[in-house]
Amino acid sequence: MAVTSLRRKLLLCAALGLLLVPGCHTVPQALPYAEAVRTPPEDVAGMRARTVTVEADHSVTSYRYPELGGAHPLTVRVRTLMARRQTDFLEDLPERGRPELHQDVSVLAASSQVVGVRLTAATEAGMSRDLTADTLWYDADSGEVLPWTALFRDDEAIERAHLALARVLRDGYNLPAQQLPGVVGEAARDQAALDEPAPSPSASPRGRPTQAPGRTEFSDPDRVREAAERWTDSPLRDAAFSTAGGLAVRMDPAQVPGAGMVREVMVPIEAADAEDLLSELGYRAREAALSGNDPGDDLVPDGDSDTPGHTLDCSQLKCVALTFDDGPGEHTDDLLDILAGYDAHATFYVLGSLVEEFPEPVERMAAEGHELGNHTWKHDDLARMPGNAIKKDIGRTNEAVRELTGTTPPTVRPPYGSLNGTVRRSVDQPLVLWDVDTLDWQSRDPEAISEHALTHTAPGSVVLFHDIHRTSVDAIPQVLAGLHRQGYHFVTVTDIFGGQGLEPGEVRTDARLT
């Protein structure tokens, strides 16, 4: 296989004593250094990147994530992790200042078999700066998104990688054993202890995971994830493949005395040392990293999808579905402008008769990632209608939306929330009501509307507004600001019920997590 030929090339270059880069050119370095293979997602064929930024009075948040189709497991995992980190950040804001959280992604490898990404989170608060990073690997064979441990054969291979880092830090940076940081230092000290007569042959070295007898490989995704839990503090969490075919491990300069005033220290594990540490996925990932990153058509499904809202797992997040009934109308465009400021995706339960009257806002809703629901043709009470009339009314509205947007409304909201058995049997879509009624049609008071929404919303709530009222639209900036400050993410009705497989005629009011 190709791994064998790569191995020969790498070992040849290593034998020549060269710092390996493509073509085996020599690059003089004062200190041991590895050039990591990291590529912006937009530079990878077939992959796009989407950036979400919200600038509020109390904070600035942004994140960029890769899009490999609307529901690709890696897209969902990356965006959900970033959204969760944003929620944690917002829930822990100080009383003063305007801290910032900026999350980004780069591609470590991409082929039809595997995609690896690096996620970074940079926080700024006053004079304080912090950067954390993690890596994820998508295995196309299993369809699983796995942590960094998937690159290694087993726990022993991870320990040997730590020892390789210890040698570089000790020999290249002149770090004495007692200054070797974290688990790298523990591994080196444990190895030194094993090289001396031990008081008990059965004793397990401090800080090292205990291997089960005969266990030689991370044989399934659960074991890979368990290993990541055991090695939470390992610098290998932020490892990439180097241009030399080995590993490039990012370490905090504060942990490496003598590194100088640099942003990051990239410690190399040479190709020859890494060769026997990698898992089968690791070999495939290395080949992808060194071969130019082409994920292929099979790995980028639905590449033309423009529905970024379908990439959040709301079962793990604080999500809320803002819904707007009875439109579109003369205020709908203003509402869409307001929603865009928070990258908020909403659901509009439209009247078929108004779809024909206000086609431009409807087209804009679809283009900007919002969802259109069916609210009947002209707001008749479905519970007072026979089954054939219900079918005709809903079908007519579906067709009006489909003609403008190319999609059929996935859900129906009966006017007044009025329904009965005939309605449930006659409608071929799920029926979605609400759990938070802002009573905006009654109060016509922006302050009262926003206060009600902010105090009654819970994770999984479906909140009812009406975009035909100016006062309702005027309340939305405060609603968005307040819920964003609480760490919420604004999604469509379909997103908030994601993965639950709602049935035709099924009635739901919310997707509350508690």
Predicted feature descriptions by range:
Residues 2-314, 320:
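Compositionally biased intrinsically disordered regions enriched in Thr/Gly
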Residues 83, 87, 91, 140-143, ...:
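Sec-exported extracytoplasmic/periplasmic mature domains
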Residues 109-110, 129-131, 241, 314-316, ...:
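Extracellular/periplasmic catalytic domains that process cell-envelope and extracellular macromolecules
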Residues 116-120, 137, 321, 347, ...:
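Soluble periplasmic/extracytoplasmic beta-strand elements of cell-envelope proteins
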Residues 120-122, 141-143, 254, 327, ...:
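Solvent-exposed coil/turn segments that connect beta secondary-structure elements
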Residues 124-125, 147-152, 321-323, 327, ...:
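Second-shell loop/turn segments in exported
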Residues 297-381, 385, 389-390, 400, ...:
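Active-site beta->alpha N-cap acidic-glycine motif
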Residues 334, 356-357, 380-510:
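Catalytic domains of cell-wall/extracellular-matrix polysaccharide-remodeling enzymes
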